[in-house]
A protein has these predicted regions:
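Helical substrate-recognition/capping region of FAD-dependent monooxygenase/halogenase enzymes
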Residues: 1-9, 13, 28-29, 97, ...
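Core beta-strand elements of the Rossmann-like FAD/NAD(P) dinucleotide-binding domain
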Residues: 6-8, 149-158
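Glycine-rich FAD pyrophosphate-binding loop
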Residues: 27-47
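Active-site-adjacent segment of FAD-dependent monooxygenases/related oxidoreductases
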Residues: 44-119
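A conserved short coil-to-beta-strand element within the FAD-binding core of flavoproteins
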Residues: 127-141
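FAD/FMN-dependent oxidoreductases across multiple families
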Residues: 235-299, 319, 341, 395
Length: 496
């Protein structure tokens, strides 16, 4: 329950895309929030680009997708080449979604849009403010922050670290960041190019010189990412970028007007747990991996989408310990799969073994044409295949639920949605009404087109589903499921 003894419900550390999105969602739900950022302003670099279909769906449910679509370059194809010869071209059009494409939006634009949305909700970023310490005591967290040499103490019901790979929150919690560094140097560059390549096609290229990826940002602007043997200067020059393209990419690409470039090394690391008491970590603070696949920012945004409704219920006195602990239990397997997938992709595209290269160049053209491979590839990359099977607060596979009624910010609170089909008999509906009497403000009922019953979580994932033979006993099963994650005094509303 919200305490008058705390200064804020949620203190968020870090105002990158993940922290900004969490702040927006806290504000949308009416939670008191404070968002601190060590930098003096938002990023001016493009950094992360790809926003995948599941993240677009989440933005839609949060009511903020429109400005992102207006700024995006839409990508619907993935081309795979080896030694400058095309091996495969996969049509990236996942079914069962409103957004069957990848939206390319530079990170500086993403941050600016999220800041604008936060201002509309009455929130703000506290720049030049760093976290010094955080200690949990007496049912809240006492933090010390520093701004321009002055330290102050604050209290929060919860603290969430979205403060990147060098996370202060993670260090304060003494959470090991387990993994390793890739033994290669990477370069990236944003350049203007001629229009040889389609603006809606992402390129994954391999060669004897190493891997290279080309992300289309607009008709003639491209992000180039590649391994490089050694750094030449403080940052890659236009000549270096052109050399990379000439060696590894499809022929005929000419780069000019270098906008931004950088060298960097990458790691694959993750923490063993995402929560310690009332403190949580998300995004790069909790996991980092290869940039091939463009999964980093999307995974972080989905972290906080999983977390925020649980914090909301906890602040309102409805969510219990098991609900909060489910954040780590649900997200860690997803993070592990992302790390494994991006690691495999990096190895496949970057292997220097002649035998492995020959095998790759032979196998990819064959398997990439198989519908089963394309479906799995698209489901993994898009985020639409994420599920929470094995979660302590889910019975079943925990797949995402797609329905137009969950769009455009219509679900502005943290209630479950119980969908009952017309085939449900009177006794089942009576059992649902009795459940309603016990769980007001926690579960919302609607009559659904599909038969049976489906319990959909506030984040759009299915907590429980039963087909067209639903019975009153299924309502009691759902009651037990809800009771395990909420406090008994929780109540529920009805739309019968």
């Amino acid at each position: 329950m919200r305490s008058a003894e705390t200064d804020t419900d949620v203190l968020i550390v870090g105002a990158g895309p993940v922290g900004l999105f969490l702040a927006n969602e806290c504000a949308r739900r009416g939670l008191r929030l404070q968002l601190i950022e060590a930098r003096s302003s938002q990023s001016e670099h493009s950094k992360a680009l790809a926003i995948f279909p599941r993240t677009l769906e989440i933005f839609d449910m949060a009511g903020i997708v429109t400005p992102f679509l207006e700024k995006a370059n839409r990508v619907s194809w993935v081309a795979v080449t080896a030694h400058q010869r095309r091996l495969s071209r996969i049509h990236f059009t996942p079914g069962g979604t409103t957004y069957p494409f990848v939206a390319m939006v530079p990170q500086d634009v993403t941050e600016r849009l999220l800041v604008d949305e936060l201002h509309k909700k009455g929130g703000a970023v506290e720049y030049d403010t760093t976290l010094v310490s955080a200690v949990e005591r007496g049912g809240h967290v006492t933090v010390t922050v520093e701004r321009k040499g002055t330290r102050t103490e604050r209290t929060a019901a919860f603290v969430v670290g979205c403060d990147g790979a060098h996370s202060t929150v993670r260090h304060l919690l003494n959470l090991p960041f387990e993994g390793a560094q890739y033994n290669v140097l990477f370069m990236l560059a944003d350049v203007e190019t001629n229009e040889v390549l389609p603006a809606d096609e992402l390129q994954l290229c391999s060669s004897q010189f190493g891997p290279l990826a080309i992300f289309p940002m607009s008709a003639n602007r491209r992000r180039v990412v590649a391994t490089i043997e050694r750094a030449e200067g403080d940052a890659p020059s236009l000549a270096v970028v052109q050399k990379m393209l000439a060696q590894r990419a499809p022929s005929g690409i000419e780069a000019f007007s270098l906008r931004w470039s950088s060298y960097f090394r990458i790691h694959h690391r993750q923490v063993g747990r995402l929560r310690v008491g009332r403190m949580f970590i998300a995004g790069d603070a909790a996991h980092i991996h290869s940039p091939f696949g463009g999964q980093g920012m999307n995974t972080g945004l989905q972290d906080v989408w999983n977390l925020v409704w649980k914090l909301d219920l906890a602040v309102r006195g409805l969510g219990n310990e098991q609900l909060l602990e489910s954040y780590s239990a649900e997200r860690r397997p997803v993070i592990q799969r992302v790390i494994e997938t991006t690691h495999r992709l990096t190895w496949v595209m970057g292997t220097t073994s002649k035998l492995a290269q020959a095998l790759r160049d032979t196998v990819i053209p064959v398997v990439s044409g198989l519908p089963a491979f394309q479906h799995r590839f698209i489901q993994n990359l898009s985020g639409l295949g994420i599920g929470y099977r094995g979660s302590p607060i889910i019975q079943g596979e925990g797949k995402r639920y797609f329905d137009e009624s969950l769009r455009e910010g219509k679900r502005i609170n943290s209630r479950y949605l119980l969908l009952l089909g017309d085939d449900c008999d009177a006794s089942t509906k009576d059992a649902a009404k009795r459940l309603c009497e016990s769980w007001n403000d926690l579960v919302e009922f609607r009559v659904a087109r599909q038969p049976g019953m489906t319990l959909v979580r506030p984040d759009g994932y299915i907590a429980y589903v039963r087909g067209n033979r639903s019975a009153p006993g299924d309502i009691e099963t759902m009651r037990a499921l809800l009771r395990r994650q909420t406090n008994k005094e929780a109540r529920c509303s009805s739309r019968f």
